[in-house]
């Protein structure tokens, strides 16, 4: 039986993680307490990924082998606390995506200048003829790009929230 991956949050990060999880053959489920944008619903539906919005159904989440948490969900949210209490691994979309690519990752974080620096590095790589993707807080999620493209490099803008739930420091 396939490993069950639950993604909490169905924005850019969560939807991208779901696409990659499904492509890797996982039993994939997405849950979002808010309304999911139609474009993300379409992305999930086109790939046969189950999802729910406006709630977190415990019976569909607490049976996960691993959870990918979107960066906007606080670490002290009730569902996160329940998952932690039962020992379910909780990771970020960035860490999950890093498992499925051999691309080199150039990650930019900090208080000021992230977007400018990330864009500048991306454009330098692109102009140099490198096969490069732009991810993180800019453009499509890293997980989506890993699922759909085959880049040699990724230039990634990371907020402090996106650094949460990354255990494998070698990923970034």
Give the residues covered by each predicted segment.
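N-terminal leader/targeting and accessory segments in enzymes
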Residues: 1-92, 96
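Phosphate-binding loop of NTP-binding sites
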Residues: 23, 59-62, 71-172
């Amino acid at each position: 039986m396939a490993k069950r991956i639950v993604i909490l949050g169905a924005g850019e990060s969560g939807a991208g993680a779901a696409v990659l999880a499904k492509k890797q053959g996982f039993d994939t489920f997405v849950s979002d307490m808010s309304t999911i944008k139609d474009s993300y619903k379409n992305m999930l539906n086109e790939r046969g990924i189950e999802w729910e919005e406006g709630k977190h159904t415990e019976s569909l989440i607490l049976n996960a082998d691993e959870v990918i948490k979107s960066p906007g969900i606080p670490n002290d949210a009730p569902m996160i606390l329940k998952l932690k209490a039962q020992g379910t691994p909780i990771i970020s979309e960035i860490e999950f995506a890093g498992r499925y690519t051999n691309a080199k990752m150039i990650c930019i974080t900090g208080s000021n200048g992230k977007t400018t620096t990330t864009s500048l590095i991306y454009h330098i790589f692109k102009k140099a003829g490198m096969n490069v993707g732009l991810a993180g807080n800019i453009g499509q999620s890293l997980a989506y790009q890993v699922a759909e493209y085959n880049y040699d490099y990724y230039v990634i803008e990371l907020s402090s929230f996106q650094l949460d739930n990354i255990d494998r420091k070698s990923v970034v």
